[in-house]
């Protein structure tokens, strides 16, 4: 990293780059990764997509050339996922993600509409999108692979956020099990955690976030950034 600014390597779901009105470019200064990087005087490599779970982070870390390029100059790595892992999913993730590939288009639209109708009705009795033990397993696989290539690099992870989304029937009964699994994994491997619920609950649960009931406003992004900076300092990153 000599002669170059360190990079904050962030693996995330859409919570990290959505604001109160929708998705934002990765360089928007109001989202928490850029607030954190600005305070550190670092660059950011933001790798994520809507709906990503910890399994997707594993795939990204091992298959995305942006991650390969960023890791040698990374000053720290953040796993900002877990929210989608803990959300209820009436269909197994593999089947749900196949909807986009259905042909012809008219049939795809009908299937998507049907799923959109079923999801809020079945979510209260559905299992997590990713079983908690798999969340922990994929996080450790990713952490281990990163540590193999960059021994001792500071790693921070997150506990799931909260939501009041009607699209999920406002159900989030899987959060606690996912949070426990992540907490135990972090304890075993010395990973510092940020509790996203603690940062954003006041904004989200009181209806001050995105109207979808899942994503955040910029006050929540600022609160997350503050907790991330504290966690990075605890993990050994010198903060200004």
Swiss-Prot record:
InterPro entries associated with the record: OctT, SGNH_hydro, SGNH_hydro_sf
Temperature dependence, free-text field: Optimum temperature is 45 degrees Celsius. Activity sharply decreases above this temperature.
Organism superkingdom: Bacteria
Matching Pfam families: Lipase_GDSL_2
Disulfide bridge positions per record: none
TM ranges: none
Catalytic activity: (2R)-2-O-[alpha-D-glucopyranosyl-(1->6)-alpha-D-glucopyranosyl]-glycerate + octanoyl-CoA = (2R)-2-O-[6-O-octanoyl-alpha-D-glucopyranosyl-(1->6)-alpha-D-glucopyranosyl]-glycerate + CoA
pH dependence, record text: Optimum pH is 7.0-8.5.
Assembly and binders: Homotetramer.
Protein name listed in UniProt: Diglucosylglycerate octanoyltransferase
Organism this protein belongs to: Mycolicibacterium hassiacum (strain DSM 44199 / CIP 105218 / JCM 12690 / 3849)
Chain's gene name: octT
């Amino acid at each position: 990293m000599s002669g170059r600014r360190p990079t904050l390597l962030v693996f995330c779901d859409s919570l990290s780059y959505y604001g109160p009105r929708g998705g934002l470019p990765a360089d928007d200064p109001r989202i928490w990764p850029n607030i954190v990087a600005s305070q550190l005087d670092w660059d950011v490599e933001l790798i994520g997509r809507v709906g990503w779970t910890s399994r997707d982070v594993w795939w990204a870390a091992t298959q995305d050339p942006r991650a390969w390029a960023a890791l040698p100059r990374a000053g720290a790595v953040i796993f900002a996922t877990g929210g989608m892992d803990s959300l209820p999913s009436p269909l197994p993730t593999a089947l749900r993600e196949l909807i986009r590939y259905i042909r012809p288009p008219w049939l795809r639209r009908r299937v998507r509409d049907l799923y959109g109708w079923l999801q809020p009705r079945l979510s209260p009795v559905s299992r997590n999108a990713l079983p908690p033990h798999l969340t922990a397993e994929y996080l450790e696989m990713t952490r281990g692979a990163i540590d193999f290539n960059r021994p001792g690099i500071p790693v921070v992870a997150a506990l799931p956020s909260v939501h009041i989304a009607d699209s999920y029937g406002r159900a989030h009964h899987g959060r606690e099990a996912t949070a426990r699994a992540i907490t135990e994994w972090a304890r075993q491997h010395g990973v510092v955690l940020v509790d996203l619920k603690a940062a954003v609950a006041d904004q989200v649960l009181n209806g001050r976030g995105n109207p979808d009931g899942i994503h955040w406003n910029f006050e929540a992004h600022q609160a997350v950034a503050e907790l991330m900076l504290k966690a990075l300092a605890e993990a050994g990153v010198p903060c200004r």
